Amino acid sequence: MEEQEIITTLKILIIGESGVGKSSLLLRFTEDTFDPEQAATIGVDFKVKTLTVEGNKTKLAIWDTAGQERFRTLTPSYYRGAQGVILVYDVSSKQSFNKLDAWLNELETFSTKHDMVKMLVGNKIDRANHEVTKDEGLKFARKHHMLFIEASAKTNDGVQCAFEELVEKIIQTPGLWETSSKNLTLSNHGPEGQGQSCYCVL
């Protein structure tokens, strides 16, 4: 059987406060592992993964950035050319949720693609002490025209779905990416039926 052609390479960013689990989400998605002692990212981490969504094989270049202020000088080059962004907060930390507006402002300032697809992820739903409700996350996502999902890098709940939904929406956005492939497949159905935790709120 012939190897399926990769139709495009997409640049995906993961942003949010330090400690919300950005690196853990990336590690779970790319390597299906979880390290409870995951150290804070210094600067930028970068991983590549191939993903097939709706019959389209894409290569994802996923950038994970440090949430700390002292690394913010990396910002302009980090955002340049990105087609998708995953904005992460910790459902057990109201403070991380309250900082989302600042991250969105930075995204608007530095992103070079105005139609970039945004996904809001409420991480660490395995924890008992939730400070942010699902409704609060959904309301914020709707207000800012973002996809939304709650997830847990620890249990792997919602992680695959988050990346698949993001990539599917990018593929369905004309002009956001380029392809030389003739194998593009477009579908017009939404994310219904892919599990209770996934919401498309655009």
Curated annotation (Swiss-Prot):
GTP binds at S18, G21, K22, S23, S24, D35, P36, T41, G67, K124, D126, A153. Keywords: Cell membrane, GTP-binding, Hydrolase, Lipoprotein, Membrane, Nucleotide-binding, Prenylation, Protein transport, Transport. PROSITE patterns: RAB. It comes from the Eukaryota. GO terms for cellular component: plasma membrane. GO terms for molecular function: GTP binding; GTPase activity. Disulfide bonds: none annotated. It is a lipid-anchor. Gene3D superfamilies: P-loop containing nucleotide triphosphate hydrolases. It is found in: Cell membrane. Belongs to the small GTPase superfamily. Rab family. This is Ras-related protein Rab-18. It comes from Lymnaea stagnalis (Great pond snail). The lineage of its organism: Eukaryota, Metazoa, Spiralia, Lophotrochozoa, Mollusca.
